[in-house]
Amino acid sequence: MGKLIDIPIVVESGQKYKTSQGVTAIKDGIKSSGQDHERLPKPKWLRIVNHTTPAYSQVKEQVQKHRLATVCEEAKCPNISECWSHGTATIMLMGAVCTRACRFCSVDTGNPHGWLDAEEPENTAETVALMNLDYVVLTSVNRDDLPDGGANHYAKTIRAIKKRSPRTKVEALTPDFQGSERDVAVLLDSGLDVFAQNVETVERLTHPVRDNRAGYQQTLNVLAFAKKYRPDVLTKTSLMLGLGETDEEIIRTMDDLRAHHVDILTLGQYLQPTKNHLPIARYVTPETFSELRQIGLKKGFFEVASGPLVRSSYRADRVFKRDNLGLDV
């Protein structure tokens, strides 16, 4: 076992370190393999334009002031400057260390041993109120170390937001809670508007892409239960493309999702976060994303956000309103 590195020393990707809470974690989630896969050249349509506006600075200030983790930062989202410049952010609950190690994800992994910030629900609600958000997305790391997977913490946060900002729509992009319907029900009873859980990839690639504790059918079952338990709550999921799936498998996955009553689908290009993560198998063209969106709409999804830089929570407020995203994503 390598020597642990204490913050604030810069930690290289794949190294172990200790967080400020004393949790041992692996930076960016995947141990360093010492190998570097040859990368495909990035196509011109994936050029990211950085935005710097006063709104960007305001969001960053609020996030830092209230010690909030955002998936925008932790998952190295390519849209961070655009979304923050529009005054919106996806807030990540329950810390920045995940108990799982999916091979596409750059969130740090480890075992928090039950640690939770008891002030986080109220801090999050205060931040949402100060930012005067019409729509907020909450997500989190997986917390298999907690008996309920963090469902009650999620629910407390949503109730706190709704109490301070009753008009704010709340979307929760959650872990799978190991398939526990009881834990999912706790969250669904909190007053949220959209329940999201990501299937991430096609069934054939689930094992090599996701942590072994995740499952394609398990995710489908949780989404189906959410819709059955609370028909008034929209259900949503996301697929990354470019991991080695075929177009036929994508369409088959759409059929599986509709059979489990999923309302909203997002499709985006997988981007390799570090050399230790899964390599990109292909870059999907904007034209293909557009075609897949139309196929999804014909299959009955309320909305399909589909484009190279689309992520689970990208333009979530517009998706919620079914605001015909078109081809500009």
UniProtKB/Swiss-Prot annotation:
It comes from the Bacteria. Binds 2 [4Fe-4S] clusters per subunit. One cluster is coordinated with 3 cysteines and an exchangeable S-adenosyl-L-methionine. [4Fe-4S] cluster 2 binds at C98, C102, C105. SUPFAM superfamilies: Radical SAM enzymes (SSF102114). One of its GO terms (cellular component) is cytoplasm. It is found in: Cytoplasm. It comes from Legionella pneumophila (strain Lens). It is an enzyme of class 2 (transferase). Its EC number is 2.8.1.8. This is Lipoyl synthase. Pathway: Protein modification; protein lipoylation via endogenous pathway; protein N(6)-(lipoyl)lysine from octanoyl-[acyl-carrier-protein]: step 2/2.
